[in-house]
């Protein structure tokens, strides 16, 4: 049975190491959502919910990695995936190149899917077998030959010990008014979508 690996780019961020680029500010990308505000910067763990949302809404067995180290990524790639999907932004394209090279060496049979805002770069086409420049669930369903009718909608929030954020779990639904960054800054590629 075919398997899918979905991942963000590898960490760490904001330091000069072999597996990352020093020009990427840790304030924005080291699993944090903040701007350079010095000691007043609020730290927060950032989860790429888009990847989780895709994984929950396809039938193909899927593993999601959130900011793995390169070592963790390569170890997972070696587990025999048919597809490896990498989500990235423009600032992390150099990392994507290294990750693609690692996939080609560790699992040459795997097809690489590139997605996220970084796909506005025309040069990314040379690195992926498939480029997702649209809504991810529908794209993956087509790629994996799954029909939307086959899969009941599933949400990424789940109860732990019968509770969600400390409250008793109840039946309900999540309505997503939109996916992706809501800001639409003129200088950013997110407005492209």
Indicate where each model-derived feature is located.
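Acidic, low-complexity intrinsically disordered segments
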Residues: 2-193
């Amino acid at each position: 049975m075919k398997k899918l690996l979905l991942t963000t780019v590898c960490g760490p961020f904001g330091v000069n190491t072999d597996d990352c680029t020093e020009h990427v500010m840790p304030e924005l990308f080291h699993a944090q959502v903040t701007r350079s505000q010095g000691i007043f910067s609020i730290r927060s763990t950032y989860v790429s919910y888009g990847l989780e949302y895709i994984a929950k809404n396809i039938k193909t067995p899927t593993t999601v990695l959130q900011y793995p180290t390169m070592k963790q990524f390569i170890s997972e790639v070696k587990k025999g995936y048919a597809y490896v999907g990498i989500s990235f932004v423009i600032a992390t394209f150099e990392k994507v190149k290294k990750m693609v090279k690692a996939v080609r060496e560790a699992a040459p049979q795997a097809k690489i899917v590139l997605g996220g805002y970084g796909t506005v770069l025309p040069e990314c086409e040379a690195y992926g077998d498939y480029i997702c420049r649209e809504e991810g669930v529908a794209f993956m369903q087509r790629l994996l030959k799954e029909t939307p009718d086959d899969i009941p909608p599933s949400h990424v929030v789940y109860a732990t010990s019968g509770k969600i954020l400390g409250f008793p779990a109840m039946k309900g639904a999540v309505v997503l008014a939109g996916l992706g960054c809501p800001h639409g800054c003129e200088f950013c590629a997110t407005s492209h979508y």
